[in-house]
Amino acid sequence: MWSSIAAFPVLVPVALACLGYEGGVPTPTAHHSNSAVIEVAAGQVFDAGWAKYDRGSGACKGQSEGDWKDAVFYLHSGATLKNVIIGANQAEGVHCDGPCTLQFVWFEDVCEDAITIKNDKAGQETWIIGGGAYHASDKIVQHNGCGTVNIINFYAEDYGKVYRSCGNCDKQCKRNVYVEGTTARNGGEVVGINLNYGDTATLKNVCADSAHPCVFYDGCAGDCEPKKVGYCSG
């Protein structure tokens, strides 16, 4: 369990208060397989009523990177998605074009990335509240924009990274992540941030079994490979 202060994330022990739901993926009320992405307009709310959505058998191509057209849901700026289960048959889970809100969104088996956030600007905030993700061989949350991502009371199991600030986007910037009340089991780092671009991370009441829940990278721009350069400590 850790907390931190921003700028250079410094982790210190705190009282246990991890609130990620540990009862598994909820039982779906219905199942919808769609041939095309579902778009949620700017500022609108899509309440799935605990139905499961996917893109049909064979949609997942492993770690082959897709785009928003391969996602199950595409949220325009300010949109909200809630009470939904994203099934295993998908290449991309949820794409946000600008800041968005996800409330109780569950991913039963992540393919490439569960959540991709892009085109958010400095000062704008994305909220991921409740929900969780299983079997993400790489990232759960991929942050390509320049705002702040808040991850609250989330549950992750069998994952590579819960959050990653883009390591090699063509245009780089400072990004911020705040993680609170989250449980992360059988995985790697909770957050990976780019030290050289001034990223900040705050972890509060996070329960993780990773030896290094917060990792520093040297990010780069374009066709390059970011390098791991250290760990947050305190």
Swiss-Prot record:
Any Pfam family the entry gives: Pectate_lyase
Gene3D superfamilies: Single-stranded right-handed beta-helix, Pectin lyase-like
Principal localisation: secreted
Cofactor(s) needed for function: Ca(2+)
GO term, biological process aspect, one: cell wall organization
Catalytic activities: Eliminative cleavage of (1->4)-alpha-D-galacturonan to give oligosaccharides with 4-deoxy-alpha-D-galact-4-enuronosyl groups at their non-reducing ends
Cofactor details (free text): Binds 1 Ca(2+) ion per subunit.
GO CC term (a single one): extracellular region
Localization per record: Secreted
Signal peptide: 1-17
EC number: 4.2.2.2
Keyword Aminoacyl-tRNA synthetase part of the UniProt annotation: no
Source domain of life: Eukaryota
Function text: Pectinolytic enzyme consist of four classes of enzymes: pectin lyase, polygalacturonase, pectin methylesterase and rhamnogalacturonase. Among pectinolytic enzymes, pectin lyase is the most important in depolymerization of pectin, since it cleaves internal glycosidic bonds of highly methylated pectins. Favors pectate, the anion, over pectin, the methyl ester.
Protein name: Probable pectate lyase F
Natural source organism: Aspergillus fumigatus (strain CBS 144.89 / FGSC A1163 / CEA10)
